[in-house]
A protein has these predicted regions:
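A short, amphipathic edge element
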Residues: 80-98, 221-237
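Bacterial signal peptide processing site
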Residues: 22-24
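Short, well-ordered alpha-helical segments enriched in acidic and aromatic residues
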Residues: 51-63, 194-200
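Short, charge-rich amphipathic alpha-helical segments embedded
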Residues: 61-83
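Bacterial N-terminal signal peptides that target proteins for export
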Residues: 1-10
Length: 302
């Protein structure tokens, strides 16, 4: 069974997310020293703007941010090299997206398959979405990296997205043509040439490429009725507890008309407020990255 075309287009955007591109300076107001609510609201604003480098710089203390950037390079250097098959597949995808007639060529391939897919799977879509929801719920429950609060929020997200996924016009030819245009436009903005350039990017290049791909994904999902920017714009931060150096807030927002919320504990360091779970996750990842080298060093000592 061939996958639906939307996941295929999203895969293209995922590849493009890794693209190298030019960096730019950010100009944001540091709200983390003002209040816990202002710190969280600024994080949301940075994500909405696609300023992921700015988000990390805002969301982490200076030492941890520098550590994150250094760990990024070490992680990339330690990755297994791409196989010949992987490199060939990525290069072919990028070349196809970069071709002058990319949009027309992809649309010509997509439209017949789209009509066939509607005949084959149109009536089964509610069932397939239901299966997907069940699998997602199980994966969330079994994920050891998520806190109980995060699991509840993720499960609520899946529940909110389910009805939309069942009713979205996935097989509409005009929307599919527009979605292809978004993917091709995103590829041209990123201007990535081959698989090697994906592996050679530094932290700043990666964050900038994430921004381009993120906005491309936003535009594509909006074609099918899922407006991520609208959801982010609706977010408001409600204070719950304030006992420095700790505080607790609730982020409330609307997704597809469904009210959702997520509680967060913040910790104050040097006058700035940071999300406790995010900070601990970054430090845990650093410890795990450093563990093999530390073990090797200890073993070598007499």
């Amino acid at each position: 069974m061939r996958p639906f075309f939307i996941p295929r287009l999203m895969t293209c955007l995922a590849v493009l997310t890794l693209a190298a591109c030019q960096s730019r300076e950010r100009t944001t107001v540091d709200a983390s020293s003002q209040s816990p609510e202002a710190a969280v609201q600024q994080s949301i604003a940075l994500v909405r703007a696609g300023d992921f480098a700015g988000f990390w710089q805002h969301a982490l203390p200076p030492h941890d941010y520098a550590m994150l950037r250094e760990d990024w390079g070490q992680t990339r250097a330690g990755e297994a090299p791409l196989s010949d098959a992987e490199r060939t597949r990525i290069d072919a995808t990028l070349q196809q997206l970069a071709a002058p007639d990319a949009a027309a060529a992809l649309d010509a391939q997509l439209q017949p398959w789209l009509a066939d897919a509607q005949l084959r799977y149109g009536d089964q879509l509610p069932l397939l979405v239901g299966i997907g929801r069940a699998l997602a719920a199980r994966a969330i429950e079994d994920d050891p990296r998520l806190t109980d609060t995060q699991k509840r929020h993720a499960a609520a997200l899946v529940d909110a997205l389910g009805p939309w996924a069942q009713q979205a016009p996935w097989f509409d030819p005009a929307r599919a043509r527009q979605a292809v245009g978004v993917v091709v436009a995103t590829a041209r903005e990123l201007d990535v040439r081959d698989a090697q350039s994906l592996r050679a990017m530094d932290f700043d290049q990666a964050m900038r490429s994430y921004a381009i791909a993120f906005h491309g994904l936003e535009r594509m999902l909006a074609l099918y009725g899922l407006e991520l920017d609208k959801a982010l714009a609706s977010a408001r931060v409600v204070p719950l507890e304030y006992h420095p150096p700790y505080a607790r807030v609730r982020v409330e927002y609307q997704l597809l008309g469904t009210p959702l919320s997520l509680e967060s504990t913040l910790v104050q360091q040097n006058g700035h407020w940071y999300d406790q779970d995010l900070l601990e996750n970054v430090r845990k990842a650093h410890r795990q990255l450093a563990a093999p080298a530390t073990a090797g060093t200890v073993a070598a000592l007499p």
